[in-house]
Design a protein with these regions (language model features):
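A beta-strand edge to alpha-helix "cap/lid" segment located at domain peripheries
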Residues: 1-18, 80-174
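Hydrophobic alpha-helical core bundles mediating ligand binding, dimerization, or RNAP-core interactions
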Residues: 27-34, 40, 51, 75-80, ...
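A solvent-exposed, acidic/Ser-Thr-rich amphipathic alpha-helical stretch
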Residues: 42-109
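Short, low-complexity N-terminal intrinsically disordered segments enriched in polar/charged residues
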Residues: 1-49, 53, 170-174
Length: 174
């Protein structure tokens, strides 16, 4: 009887492990395929689909945990909207790559990310970090970013092609 119980528990753990790995691959694939130049809303739809209402987000850069989908969405928007505007209007080239990292705990996944930003000036900034996610079924319930690195300095307005944008004082009234 005890052996049957262990077999059932092992099967359950195996399912949890494989299900979280499948969900992780699906989430990461849609993030990589999404195009910030086209829309930031695509990323919000991904967030809404894969993250639990009670999501908790943390980072090794300090600060208190951010709890709740609305609060995390607000932080996400503060990142996505400027990035979208710089890509759509300023000509910023944005590329993102993901690399799965091995793990052995059911319901937990790790991945490494690289965000490459290239201005029209030719200057680049590459950000990399690692992500730990804890899953409950198909929903992320905890996400932690760690091991942040930056190669290259921050890009400035000189690195973007903003000359096509008409300044507000350059508009004439009819």
């Amino acid at each position: 009887m005890f052996e049957d119980s262990n077999a059932a528990t092992d099967h359950f753990r195996s399912d949890l492990y494989s299900n979280s790995q499948i969900a992780e691959r699906a989430l990461n694939a849609v993030i990589v395929r999404a195009d910030i130049c086209r829309s930031f809303e695509e990323f919000l739809a991904i967030f809404d689909r894969f993250y639990a209402e009670n999501i908790e987000a943390t980072s090794d850069t300090g600060g208190e945990p951010v709890r709740g989908k609305d609060r995390v969405r607000s932080i996400l928007l503060n990142f996505l909207i400027p990035l979208h505007v710089m890509a759509e209007i300023g000509g910023l080239s944005v590329g993102i790559r993901e690399h799965a990292m091995p793990g052995d705990a059911a319901g937990e996944t790790h991945s490494a990310w690289t965000l490459e930003l290239a201005g029209t000036s030719g200057n680049t900034c590459t950000l990399s970090w690692r992500t730990f996610r804890k899953w409950n079924g198909a929903d992320v319930i905890h996400e932690h970013h760690y091991d942040h690195k930056q190669i290259g300095g921050p890009l400035t307005s000189d690195d973007l092609s903003l000359s096509a944008v008409i300044p507000a004082d350059g508009l004439r009234r009819a």
